[in-house]
């Protein structure tokens, strides 16, 4: 779906949108959260279950902060899902320096989606709570290498501006259609607006609605874009 584990050159481990335990595409070896190993920081792009699901438990296991949109984490703290110190807030355009000025820095950027947090009340009834505004994240490593994780989004014109401002080396972008970009829209964004070195399609194939495929994305991107498309299998890693 969108779960991503990043290990920076300095050894910091950042996990984005962890949904592993009930995800039908998760390999058996990764169904237990302990399989992720060390986790220093968690990023959640928005409050929908397939992005938020395992994040609070992971934060508690590792005593690691779960950063997310300000409105979402305000709800998280108010409901007692996590204590405030494990649910720090920041918003679009803001940059955090969790490990000081020489460590990785993380910037929240725009995403076009929705964000509601479903959580059971004291009686066990499912209740929908405010989830803040969805975001994407630019993660800049200690060596300047940049990853843009878009979370869930439709295409929007400011993708060009974000690309110009941050010059991401790798972009992870949703292609599943129905709730997010189609493969064709995602290809247009990569080819005409962002032009990263690498593109990794995410958020497809876990439900019947998410019918977009990497093959469609690659076909729509065509040749001559200058972008290399990587299609990892669940659990596969790349070194950059």
Language model features by range: what are they?
Residues 16-17, 39-47, 67-70, 147-153, ...:
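Active-site neighborhood of phospho(di)ester-bond hydrolases with catalytic His/Asp-centered motifs
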Residues 8-48, 53-60, 83, 114-130, ...:
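Pre-active-site segment of Zn-dependent metallo-hydrolases
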Residues 53-56, 61, 67-70, 79-94, ...:
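Glycine/small-residue-rich loop that forms an oxyanion/phosphate-binding "nest" at active or ligand-binding sites
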Residues 8-14, 95-106, 140-147, 240:
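Beta-strand-turn-beta hairpins that frame and shape the catalytic cleft
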Residues 22-23, 49-53, 73-76, 94-96, ...:
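Active-site environment of divalent metal-dependent phosphoester hydrolases
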Residues 119-192:
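Active-site-proximal loop/helix segments of hydrolase catalytic cores
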Residues 66, 77-100, 185-240:
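Binuclear metal-ion centers of metallo-dependent hydrolases, dominated by the metallo-beta-lactamase
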Residues 1, 9, 132-134:
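Extracytoplasmic
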């Amino acid at each position: 779906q969108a779960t991503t584990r990043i290990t920076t050159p300095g050894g910091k481990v950042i996990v984005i949108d962890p949904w592993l335990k009930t995800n039908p595409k998760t390999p058996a070896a990764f169904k237990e959260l302990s399989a992720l190993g060390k986790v220093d920081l968690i990023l959640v792009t928005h409050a929908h279950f397939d992005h938020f699901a395992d994040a609070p438990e992971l934060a508690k296991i590792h005593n690691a902060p779960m950063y997310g949109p300000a409105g979402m984490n305000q709800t998280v703290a108010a409901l007692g899902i996590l204590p405030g110190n494990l649910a720090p807030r920041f918003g679009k355009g803001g940059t955090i320096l969790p490990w000081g000025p020489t460590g990785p820095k993380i910037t929240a950027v725009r995403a076009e989606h929705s964000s509601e947090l479903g959580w059971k009340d004291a009686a066990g009834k499912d209740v929908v709570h405010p989830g803040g505004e969805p975001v994407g994240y630019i993660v800049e490593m200690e060596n300047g290498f940049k990853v843009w994780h878009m979370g869930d989004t439709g295409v929007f014109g400011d993708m060009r501006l974000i690309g110009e401002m941050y010059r991401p080396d790798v972009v992870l972008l949703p292609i599943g259609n129905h709730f997010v970009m189609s493969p064709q829209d995602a290809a247009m964004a990569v080819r005409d607006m962002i032009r990263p070195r690498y593109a990794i399609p995410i958020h497809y194939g876990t439900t019947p609605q998410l019918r977009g495929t990497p093959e469609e994305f690659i076909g729509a991107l065509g040749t001559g874009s200058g972008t290399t498309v990587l299609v990892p299998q669940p659990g596969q890693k790349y070194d950059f």
